[in-house]
Amino acid sequence: MLLLGVVSCGEAMSGTPVTAVNTVTSGGGQAKSGEPDPSVPRVSNPKRLRGSDPCALLTQAQLTALGLPSANKAAQAQWGEAKCTWSGDIRATLSPDTKGRGLADYYARQKAFDNFKSSQVVGYPAVWADFAHTICSVMVGVADDQVLVVHVGSVSSRSKAQGNPCGYGETVAAEVLKNLPVGG
């Protein structure tokens, strides 16, 4: 299952990615004992993303602060869940991925991406994938079995994501995390 999504976010751009170590086991991301692969970071304070409307994950005030327009476009992600895109100087897409094995699915497929780096978003494990100067996909583990996929594309040189789309994606994800209820 290929999971792609992009979201971009606000002014504060943080995050120091570390190159992920390719330690996925022959069990496809699961340890042979059936326990989760120890190389995949666990979520210590899970949030509930499952069942959320991706177009309602950011408030109007957050959209404005992030430089995103109010208007959005709902569609379906490749894996069958809803996604929402905002397009202006920045194109940002939020795509919940709540039907798989969480970040373990991404770690198991890391060689399928052009590039892959581990990161964190306000204490939640995350990865950057397929990133370049103007685009980035940020996948944030909000629970061990739920991932917020944020895909960001910088459309204009006026964009807040210009030159750091992954940092912007992390900012967007941090704003979404503020709105998610506790629980897995």
Predicted features by range, described:
Residues 1, 7-34:
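Short, low-complexity, disordered segments immediately C-terminal to signal peptides
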Residues 8-10, 54-56, 83-85, 135-137, ...:
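Sequence contexts marking disulfide-bonded cysteines in secreted/extracellular proteins
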Residues 51-70:
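Amphipathic alpha-helical segments
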Residues 65, 69-125:
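Short, solvent-exposed recognition patches
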